[in-house]
Design a protein with these regions (language model features):
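Cellulosome-associated attachment modules in secreted, modular CAZymes
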Residues: 148-204
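Disulfide-bonded cysteine motifs in exported proteins
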Residues: 3-4, 69, 106, 192
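Bacterial Sec-dependent N-terminal signal peptides
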Residues: 11-15, 197-200
Length: 204
């Protein structure tokens, strides 16, 4: 248990949740309570086009690990949440106090009986349900309280253009080399277009 607590607080993955800092970081379960994807302490969740990484905090059950990479246990128990690049999540998370949390009925071939899953739309907003045998449903579609991941979109493009050809360090100087915003920075920006924001993204 001591090892788990120690590892949960090591910042292995930068988070990219709640880009507008408006509280878009919570799912809810009747038994789990509020599930926080951007907790104040420890590591949060990071969304990529192929997977989720990091940790989330549930007020009634504690830390939930989104990948075996958090504890270097993949050689023994290989688990995690995958993203098919279209926003359809699958796989399992793990909570020390309640066990496995399934993000898709495809995991258990139960979709014909109980059709559920968690999705991420084009704006980065989560929706749907995850399921745990020990605590039941976790709802990602709660009105006014939902999880949203940062995505590179027209807001970022407008901010990038506003810095075009500026000198000196600024959020659009993505190559961190010449201290100006030029075509090299644009090439980096275009590579992230419509994808999830990388670590340290400052163009929101």
């Amino acid at each position: 248990m001591a090892i788990w607590v120690l590892l949960c607080c090591v910042n292995l993955h930068a988070e990219n949740i709640d880009p507008d800092e408006d509280g878009s970081q919570y799912a809810y379960g009747e038994n789990a309570g509020w599930v926080n994807f951007e907790p104040d302490t420890g590591d949060g969740a990071a969304v990529a086009s192929d997977k989720l990484t990091g940790w989330v905090w549930a007020e009634n059950i504690g830390w939930i690990s989104l990948t075996c990479e958090n504890t270097t246990s993949c050689g023994t128990v290989n688990y995690g949440i995958t993203n098919d690049s279209a926003g359809n999540l699958s796989g399992y998370a793990w909570a020390e106090n309640v066990g496995w949390v399934s993000f898709s009925c495809d995991n258990t071939s139960s979709c014909g009986t109980v059709d559920y899953g968690v999705t991420i739309d084009g704006d980065g907003a989560f929706d749907g349900y995850a399921w745990s045998e020990n605590i039941g449903w976790i709802n990602f579609g709660i009105a006014n309280n939902y999880v949203r991941a940062c995505k590179v979109n027209f807001e970022d493009l407008a901010n990038f253009v506003s810095y075009w050809l500026d000198n000196g360090a600024n959020p659009a100087d993505l190559d961190d080399e010449a201290d100006d915003v030029d075509f090299e920075d644009y090439a980096i920006f275009s590579g992230y277009w419509q994808d999830f924001c990388p670590d340290g993204w400052q163009l929101k």
